[in-house]
């Protein structure tokens, strides 16, 4: 199947950040990111998916952190991961704090779900 895709994409100017060892944004190379589908509390199953994603070319992997068991599991997952781990946070700002304590490389907050200024300040 033939696609008429441009050979070059125009990129918006953005600020570069580091997600673990991977530069993202700015003029950094485009990175591949994916997300696990396991319950993060399943440490071995989640690590198996992370290793498979890394072998397939993922530079960064996101794991959901929607309950305390997931946050606790991240403390065991992060040091064994071959790629930087991003905690995907949904509604509870305390999960973001727990994920940071577990050593994740970055947080992804669903826009608008953490609204109280005190909660935003605690995470920032």
Regions found by a protein language model. Give the residues of each.
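Alpha/beta enzyme core
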Residues: 2-4, 9-63, 67-124
